Amino acid sequence: MNGKIWVLGDAVVDLLPDGEGRLLQCPGGAPANVAVGVARLGGDSGFIGRVGDDPFGRFMRHTLAQEQVDVNYMRLDAAQRTSTVVVDLDSHGERTFTFMVRPSADLFLQPEDLPPFAAGQWLHVCSIALSAEPSRSTTFAALEAIKRAGGYVSFDPNIRSDLWQDPQDLRDCLDRALALADAIKLSEEELAFISGSDDIVSGIARLNARFQPTLLLVTQGKAGVQAALRGQVSHFPARPVVAVDTTGAGDAFVAGLLAGLAAHGIPDNLAALAPDLALAQTCGALATTAKGAMTALPYKDDLQRSL
């Protein structure tokens, strides 16, 4: 198949602690990370979104272009500023985020910013793109357009509750996006939030019954991944690594997964899914072994050596 993978949303400059009182400027943002992750694996990826026509925005556009991501639909907005996030890391490499620019340029995405979609292509989005207008309406228009064209939707909620003024808006937008998604990736916490159940088996059953995605993946960190494919459910253990920074692990996982799905299609059974999940899990594991979300994303050669 080898369909193009479009990724829509925010491109962010992450500011990471780097010694006493210093911050390291790193390219990031979950959608931008996924686009670069796919390109590093040899996939055809394109980024859809807005950044400010400012030093950070030009830095992000140049970075993605250098990574061989199609940036023809990555707009520079002179009226807005690029999203900037301070990332705090604890002793285990776990992170918290402080968003410094609100609203940022990515939330001003317009329908005219969208590419023409085609059959066999994928569109991956996160919920930050749904958190405010006009990005919300534009993102839903994109999701509906690629489905009409015969393409596929991948959704990673990547919930940041503090970016939403109305909690009910968050739930309504999540429900609408989940109903359009062919492939869904959630954390355990997100599964509990959306399903209303702290039991992972019950939560998966509830989401499958309500939204009927073809593929639902629940990442459990060191415990691995729970996968539900066409009604079949199985657990896939994780490979052990020493984590330095977990910032880009989920995005690397999604990039590996999408690269596999775009190349082979969504499999009919869990046994056929196993190679794509192994690729995704290896990408996620390797991304935790270095500091920075995008800088740690693995290349195809890294995977071949690891596998």
Swiss-Prot record:
The keyword Kinase applies. It catalyses: D-fructose + ATP = D-fructose 6-phosphate + ADP + H(+). Gene3D superfamilies: 3.40.1190.20. The keyword Transport does not apply. It comes from the Bacteria. SUPFAM superfamilies: Ribokinase-like (SSF53613). Transmembrane segments: none annotated. One of its GO terms (molecular function) is ATP binding. GO terms for biological process: fructose metabolic process. Keywords: ATP-binding, Carbohydrate metabolism, Kinase, Nucleotide-binding, Transferase. InterPro entries: Carboh/pur_kinase_PfkB_CS, PfkB_Carbo_kinase, PfkB_dom, Ribo/fructo_kinase, Ribokinase-like. CDD domains: bac_FRK. It is an enzyme of class 2 (transferase). Pfam families: PfkB. Its EC number is 2.7.1.4. Involved in sucrose metabolism. Belongs to the carbohydrate kinase PfkB family. This is Fructokinase. It comes from Klebsiella pneumoniae. The lineage of its organism: Bacteria, Pseudomonadati, Pseudomonadota, Gammaproteobacteria, Enterobacterales.
